[in-house]
Amino acid sequence: MLAGVLNHSIIKRFGRADNGDIYVFSPSYAKTMADKRQQTTLDAGVVRIKAGTEEFDPDYYYSIEAQTGGKSFIRCWHITGDYFLLLMYDRSLTETGFTANQLAIYKGETGKLTYVTGLPSADLISGFGNTPYVENGYAYMAVTTTEGYPSIYKIDPVGAVATKGVSIEATQISGVGKLQPQN
């Protein structure tokens, strides 16, 4: 059952690390509910199900908000090992006008979140591709800005560093991938 869910999430908020551990990311959207009975006081955070078990690890919880000054995220993707790429909001969900214009790397084993450097200034970013392309331990993400053409950035999860690659003469890039020849 869990394997099917891992492969069919509409908005990805969990993933399996290479060692089989499953990380579940909660953006804590319930903070924004109008009905007080539905609201939560819990931070956006991460819990884990260790490989070979079916229960949440009672000793594992890391607050995303504690590491970001109260910011949350909209989605996440597994890159390699226990590294995950998160699409981050620019402010707390309890504020108005928040937008997802930043990327961060989450390291499962340590629970550390690090913002990706090497990207254009967040105030210039108008969008990201729908899903990164992942190959050989790197994520490739389309980044659209309000100045110039969109570009593909190669993201090294270990250093949380993005390197600008090719720019495309277009207004937006929704995704990036690689074609393989069929035999």
List PLM regions with ranges.
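Short coil/turn segments that connect the beta-strands within blades of beta-propeller domains
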Residues: 19-21, 80-83, 135-138
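Beta-propeller blade signature
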Residues: 1, 37-54, 99-111, 152-160
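Long, internal scaffold/assembly segments composed of regular secondary structure
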Residues: 1-52
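Beta-propeller fold detector
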Residues: 1-2, 51, 56-66, 112-121, ...
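Repeated scaffold domains used in trafficking and secretory/extracellular systems
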Residues: 4-14, 66-80, 123-133, 168-182
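Short, conserved, GDST-rich strand-edge loop motifs in beta-rich repeat architectures
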Residues: 24-43, 86-100, 144-145
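C-terminal structural cap/anchor segments
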Residues: 66-127, 154-162
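Hydrophobic, glycine-enriched assembly/anchoring segments
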Residues: 149-183
